Swiss-Prot record:
HAMAP family hit by this protein: Thymidy_synth_bact
Keyword annotations from UniProtKB, A to Z: Cytoplasm, Methyltransferase, Nucleotide biosynthesis, Transferase
Gene (name only): thyA
Organism superkingdom: Bacteria
Role summary: Catalyzes the reductive methylation of 2'-deoxyuridine-5'-monophosphate (dUMP) to 2'-deoxythymidine-5'-monophosphate (dTMP) while utilizing 5,10-methylenetetrahydrofolate (mTHF) as the methyl donor and reductant in the reaction, yielding dihydrofolate (DHF) as a by-product. This enzymatic reaction provides an intracellular de novo source of dTMP, an essential precursor for DNA biosynthesis.
Localization annotation: Cytoplasm
Family: Belongs to the thymidylate synthase family. Bacterial-type ThyA subfamily.
Upper lineage: Bacteria, Pseudomonadati, Pseudomonadota, Gammaproteobacteria, Enterobacterales
Residues that bind dUMP: R21, R126, R127, R166, S167, C168, D169, N177, H207, L208, Y209
Annotated organism of origin: Sodalis glossinidius (strain morsitans)
Protein name, UniProt field: Thymidylate synthase
Catalytic activity field: dUMP + (6R)-5,10-methylene-5,6,7,8-tetrahydrofolate = 7,8-dihydrofolate + dTMP
Gene Ontology BP terms: dTMP biosynthetic process; dTTP biosynthetic process; methylation
Length: 264
């Protein structure tokens, strides 16, 4: 994952100091792209230990269309706690938009089910896109979508994905986001009888928080290690029937974890 460290170096060298919604302050650049070959290993950062269990549970939660943190809390995943209301609700965030986008005439669109249909029936389509950026519901969301839109592309039997992330917390958020979408590509490839291809990440406001700079500098002293391998042990009936125990990671021997505060 040299690309990730190169991005961090770029922001440290060229980033502009900016104020932000959280009041923390950032070093920020605008516009950056990274390309990863998913065939080379599972995209989990090795220059610090990442919490794959949380990544898997969060993705399963998204895929279930859930927007209440009860499932996450039951599985000891706390990454959304700071934004939930007293009832654990987050409003119409990712899961709602992915699985039940509301239309003006009262219908609901399951964008991910449509992705599966298109990948199987019309894989050359240029419209295999999922958006979480529902302008009409942004004011109801506890947190506006950071990873806002993603598109799939099939060529020569391989499945690739490009994500546009309008706002990116490089140190804490980005390793989660990359691994989550890599996992989704692996799941969709299995469901649609494809091989994994590339994951392309495109960032808008791409930043290091001012209270993450020392941690970033420490991470930049470390050399990337070999990527782990992902095994999906079962092929469920649909994309929405995967369980946590279906996934096994082997060969993950990263550098030690580096703690940093979350900007809320």
């Amino acid at each position: 994952m040299k690309q990730y460290l190169d991005l961090m170096r770029r922001v440290r060298a060229q980033g502009t100091p900016k104020a932000d919604r959280t009041g923390t302050g950032t070093l920020s650049i605008f516009g950056h792209q990274m390309r990863f070959d998913l065939r080379q290993g599972f995209l989990l950062v090795t220059t610090k230990r990442c919490h794959l269990r949380s990544i898997i549970h969060e993705l399963l939660w998204f895929l279930n269309g859930d927007t209440n943190i009860a499932y996450l809390q039951q599985n000891n995943v706390s990454i959304w706690d700071e934004w939930a209301d007293d009832n654990g609700d987050l409003g119409p965030v990712y899961g709602r938009q992915w699985r039940a986008w509301g239309t003006s005439d009262g219908r609901q669109i399951d964008q991910l089910a449509e992705v599966v249909r298109q990948l199987k029936q019309d894989p050359d389509s240029r419209r295999i896109i999922v958006s979480a950026w529902n302008v009409g519901e942004l004011d109801k969301m506890a947190l506006a979508p950071c990873h806002a839109l993603f598109q799939f592309y099939v060529a020569n039997g391989t499945l690739s994905c490009q994500l546009y992330q309008r706002s990116c917390d490089i140190f804490l958020g980005l390793p989660f986001n990359i691994a989550s979408y890599a996992l989704l590509v692996h799941m969709l490839a299995q469901q649609c009888d494809l091989q994994v291809g590339d994951f392309v990440w495109t960032g808008g406001d791409t930043h290091l928080y001012s209270n993450h700079l020392q941690q970033a500098d420490l991470q930049l002293t470390r050399d990337p290690l070999p990527l782990p391998q992902l095994l999906i042990k079962r092929r469920p009936a649909t994309l929405f029937d995967y369980r946590f125990e279906d996934f096994e990671l082997t060969g993950y021997d990263p550098h030690p974890a580096i703690k940093a505060p979350v900007a809320v």
